[in-house]
Amino acid sequence: MNIFQTIVLALVQGLSEFLPISSSAHLILVPELTNWTDQSLAFDVVVHMGTLSAVIFYYQAMIKCLFFDFYHSIIKRQTIGESKLAWGVLLGTIPVGLVGMIFRDSIATDLRSVEIIAYATLVFGVLLGFASWFSHRNKNQKSTISWVDIGFIGMAQTLALIPGTSRSGITITACMLVGLSRKLSIQFAFLLSIPVISLSLILILIDLYHQAQLVNVSLLAMGFVVAAISAYVTIVFFIKLIDAVGMMPFVIYRLTLGIFLFFFIL
């Protein structure tokens, strides 16, 4: 990888990780459309570390609160403050973690085609549009999350293992479908990203441990910085944009991309 490829792929990771457009799909598509070689495992590690750092930095105050209330809920064996939300993040991660580990090899080899990405981009784009429409018309949006909601959202998140689905997209979709407010939907979806990205990072590190690779430290450092900054800016921008215009710009983008990909594979 050269400097230009490093910047482009780190930007793709940082910009698409928290937008409902699928970072995994874009990281597959960019090398596919440009004939670049796949990025190294070491590069995957640093850009995931970058996006993880961004979301932790953005939600640092809330994360401290969640840890505090989670700890005291265990000690006192009762719900305290935001402890239910903390438990929700933990329990909502279990389904995708289990499915991801069980079907890891199949996902890595059988679900990376442009055709699958095209179908997932279109189908889950339409679903995101419906959920946004439903949420807009729902006059009784919930400001708290139930255990049933957590179970449904956690199961829905397993669909993010299909490239083109978008982890943030499917979790926000599920949140809106169960009636959560838009603010809580985005907040819960982004908090869920922390353990999920962490699990992905651990698995990549395990693979990297078993594969000796020569690395360019300066390019890796650049990838981390670009991914972290672009991810943080994206989080800030996305939250403000959603308040102003809703999800439709991303629905339109997904439908346009999906149609383009079908023309590409024909």
From Swiss-Prot:
GO terms for biological process: cell wall organization; peptidoglycan biosynthetic process; regulation of cell shape; response to antibiotic. One of its GO terms (molecular function) is undecaprenyl-diphosphatase activity. It is found in: Cell inner membrane. It is a multi-pass membrane protein. The keyword Phosphoprotein does not apply. One of its GO terms (cellular component) is plasma membrane. Keywords: Antibiotic resistance, Cell inner membrane, Cell membrane, Cell shape, Cell wall biogenesis/degradation, Hydrolase, Membrane, Peptidoglycan synthesis, Transmembrane, Transmembrane helix. Its EC number is 3.6.1.27. InterPro entries: UppP. The chain crosses the membrane at residues 1-21, 43-63, 83-103, 114-134, 144-164, 186-206, 219-239, 245-265. It comes from the Bacteria. It catalyses: di-trans,octa-cis-undecaprenyl diphosphate + H2O = di-trans,octa-cis-undecaprenyl phosphate + phosphate + H(+). It holds the Pfam family BacA. PANTHER family: UNDECAPRENYL-DIPHOSPHATASE. Belongs to the UppP family. Catalyzes the dephosphorylation of undecaprenyl diphosphate (UPP). Confers resistance to bacitracin. Bacitracin is thought to be involved in the inhibition of peptidoglycan synthesis by sequestering undecaprenyl diphosphate, thereby reducing the pool of lipid carrier available. This is Undecaprenyl-diphosphatase. The gene is uppP.
